[in-house]
Amino acid sequence: ERRSWTAALCCCMGWALTAAPAGAAPASLTLDVPDLGEPVGIAADLSEGRYWVTDGTTSGRTTVVSVGDDGKLGTKLNWQAPTTDVQALSWYDEHLYVGDIGDSARRRDHIQVLSPMSLNGGSASWMAWDFSYPDGPHDAAAMAVSPRGNMYFITRGDKPAIYRTRSNPSRTGVNALIKVADAPAGVTDATFLADGSRIAMRTDNAIHVVDAYSWHTIGAANFTDGGGEAMTTDLRQANLELTTSATKVTTAQIPSKVEKIAAVPTASSDHTASQKPTAATEPDSSRSTSKRPVGTVAAIIGAVVLAVVAGVFVGLWGRREDA
């Protein structure tokens, strides 16, 4: 009987060791979409288990495609909305949001966000909202929608900052945005994480995670795996998916501690070493009850500890049996 208990314990130990890597980031994704340029926006569709992608080229400005978790083309969505510079996609409450927010010349008196009313493919009607910055035109490439439905825009260029919409924006007029914090330089995309209280932001060389209440940086990690601009969560919201070329999407873990970010060797003021966001006014006040994902490292450490304890236990049990 004692040998049976020992065998069972060893089996549990073996299961823990083999199960631990399951928390690791899944394999990278290859986008198999003909004529797709380098994506500027990607959003995880948590309802249907797919990703929406747009490349921001002339044709891409009126086309968004979906791909499965195998990278294969699914739905091609067209709509007739006039746009200026589509730069971002976001997903919230079973709706896709398209950020027409680019303004490299800083000449637009307002930006717009579109939301197709159907995601079944083909042509679609859309909803649209117009927004203006309180301090003049800005170029932006990043948009994220909070669990409360507030839209956040992260500008780039001189004095990069984070702005958000007021609750229930009008669809018949131009809505004034609120500046909530300074932002890291050169942000190209952003997404809310599963708990709804953190925003992940991507730059040319790093991933930053900020608390959406205090606007303090709570995680930062270097990321230099190729080029690319777009970022979203994976379909489990446990990791991040970052585009690194027209066809490649690389998985990265969500930073949980602040690393020193290496400076990008460029003369552009948009892409200098990142700065920490600083709080301004009115952070989003909604907090999701979703559980935060457990990291791979924690799973491995737990398995190792279990293995050590099991080894000691088996050794002591064996000694008792021999005595």
Write out the residue ranges for each language-model feature.
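Sequence/structural signature of beta-propeller domains
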Residues: 23-323
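N-terminal secretory signal peptides that target proteins for export/translocation
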Residues: 1-2
